[in-house]
Amino acid sequence: MRDRTVALYARQGTGLGGQELPAVLSEAQVRQAEEQCGVEFPEDYRQYLLRVSAGGRVRRLRFDGARWDWEGAGFWDHEKLYVPFPDHDVALAASEDAWERRPKREDHPSDAAYQAEYDTWQEAADELEAARVAGAAFLHDDGCGFHTLLVVSGPMRGTMWFDGRATCDRLNPLLNDDRRAATFTEWYLDWFAHEESLTTPEQRRATYENWHAGVGAPIWYRWFAS
């Protein structure tokens, strides 16, 4: 699979041409990353790191001299990978309840009193929001504040999710053809098959128009319909 992925990245007209596919990691390196995170990565993602690449379609997992993390991740993004990924509806309800209790200036006798309560509320709201993605790695940056997540802890371990909170406040599972949350392997191989088939810029534009219309969309693009 690595050879085919290298060839895809080298091919012009794919949108990937000219990019270099990062090297694989060793078993020792993967274990170091897992020990630091306090988890064992889902087996298919582990095999990707060992046999295909430390990056590529996903953010590169690398050691910066002090710690292992995914390239481009915020310092606190992966602080609690060992915590089980929560039930989405329960976590969303807690977040919405917090926003309904957002302090209002008119309810306070002074600016100072309002700011003090607002700061306390903001800290609690931030913690609730972070808890919604505990146990999940920000594996791919989709731009505009959107991310694709790989769940590494809890009952949904091994499944792929889309973080659409930038606009809709929701986290949705990325569904396979059976309407179940896709695994990393399903997500990656589906992306690869679609990408490998797009050989010209014209074909790419036409295909993306179809996807946007809901026709033949790959797993990674299905968050609109999740």
What are these model-derived regions, one by one?
Residues 5, 14, 120, 148, ...:
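Residue-identity detector for threonine
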Residues 168-226:
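Long, compositionally biased interface segments
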Residues 64, 153-155, 185, 203:
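Basic, Gly/Ser/Thr-rich N-terminal segments that form RNA-phosphate-binding interfaces in CRISPR RAMP
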